[in-house]
Amino acid sequence: MKSVYGPVSSWRLGRSLGIDPVCSERKICSFDCVYCQLGHGIKTDKRQEFVSLEKLKEDLKLIAGAGADVITFSGTGEPTLAKNLGAMIEHVKTVSSLPVAILTNSSLFSDVDVHRALSRLDIVVAKLDAPNPSVFSAINRPYEGIRFEKYLEGIKNFRKSYTGKFALQMMFIDINRDYAGEMAEIARVLEPDEIQINTPLRPCAVKPLSRAEIERIKEFFSAFRNVLSVYDAEKPEVKPIDIEEVRKRKRPEP
């Protein structure tokens, strides 16, 4: 399994070349979100090295010339669980002039090393699906010991010091659709550069909300300058280097 895949067509980031710092046949994550397209996996908050820096360097050589707008750390689990994430980010930024992003569930922002590593990125897309502990537990099903209050405080502290583009992704399903107003209030405190309103259109265990429902939710975020919706955003055409690597991450195919 290669640590690099794509490019894939991202409604948020454009043509995205993926780097998977976990690179596991089975999902490894600090959450077990009810809407995850990867299904159940290994739930942990322990950071470790999954992919060596040398392997990443070799895999990057195989995709030279891949047409992409951005390089994104995302894949078969929570990317911040990779203990050598900082070294990976540093290497990618030395070999490419493309902006470098991450899709994170925000669970490890309180970790000093994670905070430092993510500060080097051009774009951080942080997950926030809940306004309170009960909804947090119901949707994200976090690893034991991850408490909502600390989770939210970690996002706030990171946002205060981060100078790149900070996007807040909110996945709406039946469980949290009536909490959009409360989540908008939290977003006002966090002051993201962008709000991404999502619902699970990929095959998973829960049904997506309709376009009309998402439009109603968007109204709560009308005060924000930059709000994207999964139903409205355009997706560019892409040609993955290796379609099988895309399939392993259960990403949509072109």
Annotate each PLM feature.
Residues R12-L53:
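Canonical Radical SAM [4Fe-4S] cluster-binding loop centered on the CxxxCxxC motif
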Residues Y35-G41, G67-V70, A130-V135, K165:
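Short, basic/glycine-rich phosphate-binding loops at helix/coil junctions
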Residues K46-L53, E144-F148, K207-I214:
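Flexible, glycine- and charge-enriched loops at secondary-structure boundaries
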Residues K55-E58, A87, E182, R216:
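Alpha-helical elements of Rossmann-like donor-binding domains used by nucleotide-donor carbohydrate transfer enzymes
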